[in-house]
């Protein structure tokens, strides 16, 4: 490592332009912008082939509390909260303590209704159905005053034969949603009068079944008894909507996905694509197509397989007994690889359903990637791990939770932006947590395109479930079958998991091993399925001694395995905090509103944050903003400790998925990116500690030794040069050296032992910093700075920062020079949101670093300089000010 080094960020200008281009997509996040409520299109009739559809979505709906007057306009898809917010009937649930003021919404029934016009050509079809892609949750549907159905599952796709209930011309649809919020009271007192509400009747029926089974043993004093009073055990609705330790309860209802009338002669129900890979040569696809053919006509399925828009194979097959199966050979197959390991080509399989007159009755397109994925169990000291196309690799990424506690506020553009962020930070895997709602196809599509593998969890979390009830189990079977059929073609899905952290209970095996596992293996042969994520002995590790037990970060050094959940909390960015507080709330980090937005550890999460700040950074700062920034630095430091330990110990550890990538409401949580999509220090740090090539230290303080490891996740061996320096806190070099390294593909190995005992004896352990820089082909690929003591014991002088600003195509280029060590240096525009090419970096004395900054609004150079703040950890940590 040379002094006066100009450091180039690893975020290229092209990547930076792509990142900033997506900023506008995020403005729909509530409270983060002035985005308005946009009405949707009105319904209209469309013909595709011989299928006729009438979209019932749009802004022609009205919604009213049952038994009340004064309805408001409703948008479909949508939900009751967005409709009431648009009408000004409720306050912003995210602001201050407003969430307490909107709880009544989930405790009362709501009625959605509209009229619509049916054209003769729709009713002329042999079959006409109402297709509801998502009803949240306990619904009763009437058309023209006639009862159609009473669905009770938020996650299912509902189809009802309604031809006999329709007429040409004006028709009327009414959907009533019974409240889900009041089931908690019913569960706690199952003998109370339910008032005849279907929701309450459901809970009482299930409770009675368990009362008969367990008798007097089922009491409110037992864990199982308490859990049975929780509505998330009974109702097939996203569990987090009743509140979690990172969000409050927001019990939604409404038509949250598309709704339409479909008229058809025959239609395709499902297309499943199964692969058979030979050692060399072509890949054989077996395309299984299921159709609905009410007229029992002679039908033919025509198949066209395309890559990059060009046809690579065609075939056709006669449909027999509403099914057909055809093998199609793909010559010169292009394999799909995870992010960082290769390309992610996607093959499109188009299926046209034709009658004997060659008329296309229906058409479906499905995409897939050609790959062989294996999940190997723990064995002979090796952790559970993934292998793709014969290559074992380390899984890097995070856990995904819903992007908003009001789902209709989340757009495909927002989801894609999050997935792009993950790919830019070298993630190759995400875990879709089991307590939310099933992620939409647009999110899986983005993962397919970006090479992000997925651990798919069915939506069961942290509760026992009423497996004794036959109707409840039938409901779940239909839900699971739908999810497997919808998602099995996605190459991104690596692991199917039955639940998140559901403790063993009477019926566990029946639900998670036999029922869900059986359906996965039936519909997706060869897929890897585990009954639950984080289950003891599974090899899928959730570790919470750090944070949960307040253990120090060094506790991570005792953990091995396929780690899919671990985390430390921090506050969101000050700008985000300002969206949910007023000025008086920000006079103290411990104010009532600041505590209201912290839901972890039974409301003691702020105390946990302060515990870790004290442990590593000494007495926290007095002002709120400094405490916020310092909490983010602390979080990044802790998670980096765990990730680098597991990467250094590759084979004994083969995954590091951080809890959690994102937020669904604003407040202090474990997230890497806050609710307003502002990157925390941890997200910036992840791009460095998840880099394909990593240089990482292992300190043995008592021995006066630092072992340097090089981790190479790439598919090729690398050769490079390492420069290292030991400096004082004032930037004086006391020792340095260089050496060459060779790192085989997909390995971790110790490359050097650096001894600092003599320097420590002369200067003191708390007066030294170790720096190292790894270059491959002359380019910096990884660097590090490590201290030999906790940060609070480093008494740093002022770094002597200077900077220049110039306008550039992507915004502004900022060049920062430092005379002395500048630790955890970051840029921030005080009153303006912006995207930054990097942040929270360590600047070696005498170095110059270049940032690219893209503000949300247009600024002159003078305005930009007025907003710009350049800070280091020394500015926000009193104990480190030497």
Can you say where each PLM-predicted feature lies in the sequence?
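Charged/polar, solvent-exposed surface patches and flexible loops
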Residues: 417, 478, 482, 518, ...
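Conserved acidic
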Residues: 108, 414, 472, 508, ...
């Amino acid at each position: 490592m040379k002094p006066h080094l100009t450091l180039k960020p690893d975020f290229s200008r092209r990547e930076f332009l792509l990142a900033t281009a997506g900023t506008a997509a995020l403005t729909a996040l509530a409270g983060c912008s002035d985005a308005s409520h946009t009405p949707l299109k009105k319904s209209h009739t469309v013909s595709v082939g011989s299928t006729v559809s009438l979209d019932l979505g749009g802004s022609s709906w009205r919604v009213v509390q049952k038994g009340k007057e004064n309805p408001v306009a409703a948008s479909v898809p949508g939900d009751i909260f967005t409709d009431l917010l648009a009408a000004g009937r409720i306050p912003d649930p995210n602001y201050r303590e407003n969430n307490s003021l909107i709880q009544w919404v989930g405790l009362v029934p709501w009625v959605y209704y509209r009229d619509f016009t049916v054209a003769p050509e729709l009713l002329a079809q042999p079959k006409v159905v109402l297709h509801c892609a998502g009803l949240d949750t306990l619904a009763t549907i009437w058309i023209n005053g006639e009862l159609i159905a009473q669905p009770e599952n938020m996650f299912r796709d509902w189809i009802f034969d309604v031809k006999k209930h329709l007429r040409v011309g004006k028709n009327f649809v009414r959907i009533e949603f019974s409240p889900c919020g009041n089931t908690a009271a019913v569960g706690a007192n199952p003998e109370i009068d339910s008032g005849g509400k279907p929701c309450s009747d459901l809970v009482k029926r299930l409770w009675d079944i368990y009362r008969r089974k367990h008798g007097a043993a089922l009491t409110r004093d037992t864990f199982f008894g308490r859990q049975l009073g929780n509505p998330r055990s009974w109702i097939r609705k996203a569990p987090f909507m009743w509140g979690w330790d990172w969000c409050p309860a927001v019990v939604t209802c409404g038509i949250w996905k598309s709704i339409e009338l479909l008229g058809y002669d025959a239609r395709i129900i499902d297309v499943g694509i199964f692969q058979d890979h030979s050692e060399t040569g072509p890949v054989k696809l077996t395309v299984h197509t299921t159709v609905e053919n009410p007229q029992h006509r002679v039908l033919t399925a025509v198949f066209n397989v395309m890559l990059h828009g060009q046809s690579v194979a065609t075939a056709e097959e006669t449909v027999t007994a509403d099914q057909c199966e055809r093998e199609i050979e793909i010559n010169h197959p292009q394999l799909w690889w995870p992010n960082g390991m290769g390309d992610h080509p996607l093959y499109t399989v188009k299926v046209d359903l034709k009658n004997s007159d060659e008329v296309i009755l229906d058409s479906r397109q499905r995409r897939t990637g050609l790959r062989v994925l294996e999940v190997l169990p723990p064995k002979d000291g090796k952790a559970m791990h993934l292998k793709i196309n014969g290559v074992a690799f380390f899984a890097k990424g995070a856990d995904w939770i819903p992007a908003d506690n009001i789902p209709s506020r989340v757009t495909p553009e927002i989801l894609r932006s999050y997935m792009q962020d993950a790919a830019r930070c070298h993630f190759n895997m995400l875990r879709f947590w089991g307590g939310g709602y099933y992620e939409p196809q647009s999110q899986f599509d983005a993962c397919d395109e970006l090479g992000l593998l997925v651990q798919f969890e069915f939506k069961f979390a942290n509760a026992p479930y009423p497996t004794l009830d036959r109707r409840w189990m039938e409901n779940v079977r239909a839900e699971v079958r739908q999810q497997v059929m919808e998602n099995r073609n996605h190459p991104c899905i690596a692991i199917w998991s039955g639940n998140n952290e559901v403790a063993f209970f009477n019926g566990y095996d029946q639900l998670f091993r036999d029922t869900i596992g059986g359906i996965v293996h039936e519909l997706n042969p060869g897929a890897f399925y585990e009954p639950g994520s984080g289950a003891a002995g599974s090899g899928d590790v959730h570790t919470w001694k750090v944070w949960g037990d307040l253990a120090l970060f060094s506790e991570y050094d005792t953990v091995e395995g396929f780690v899919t959940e671990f985390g430390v909390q921090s506050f969101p960015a000050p700008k985000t905090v300002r969206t949910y507080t007023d000025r008086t709330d920000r006079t103290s980090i411990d104010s009532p509103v600041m505590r209201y937005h912290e839901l972890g550890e039974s409301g003691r999460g702020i105390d946990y944050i302060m515990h870790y700040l004290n442990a590593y950074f000494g007495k926290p700062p007095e002002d709120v903003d400094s405490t916020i920034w310092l909490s983010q630095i602390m979080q990044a430091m802790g998670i980096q400790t765990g990730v680098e330990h597991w990467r250094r110990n590759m084979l004994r550890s083969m995954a590091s998925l951080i809890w959690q990538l994102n937020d669904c409401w604003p407040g202090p949580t474990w997230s890497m990116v806050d609710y307003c999509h502002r990157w925390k220090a941890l997200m910036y740090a992840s791009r460095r500690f998840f880099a394909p090539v990593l240089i990482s230290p292992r300190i043995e303080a008592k021995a006066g030794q630092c072992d340097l490891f090089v981790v190479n996740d790439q598919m090729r061996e690398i050769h490079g040069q390492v420069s290292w320096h030991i400096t004082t806190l004032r930037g004086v070099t006391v020792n340095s050296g260089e050496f060459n390294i060779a790192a085989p593909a997909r390995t971790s190995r110790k490359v050097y032992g650096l001894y600092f005992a003599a320097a420590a004896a002369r200067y003191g352990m708390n007066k030294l910093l170790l720096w190292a820089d790894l270059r491959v082909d002359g380019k910096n690929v990884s660097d590090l700075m490590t201290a030999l003591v906790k940060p609070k014991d480093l008494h740093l002088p002022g770094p002597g920062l200077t900077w220049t600003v110039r306008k550039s195509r992507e915004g502004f280029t900022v060049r920062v020079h430092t005379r002395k060590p500048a630790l955890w240096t970051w840029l921030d525009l005080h009153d303006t949101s912006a995207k930054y090419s990097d942040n929270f970096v360590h600047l070696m004395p005498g170095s110059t670093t270049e940032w690219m900054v893209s503000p949300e609004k247009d600024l002159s150079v003078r305005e930009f300089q007025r907003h710009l703040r350049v800070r280091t950890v020394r500015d926000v940590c009193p104990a480190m000010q030497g």
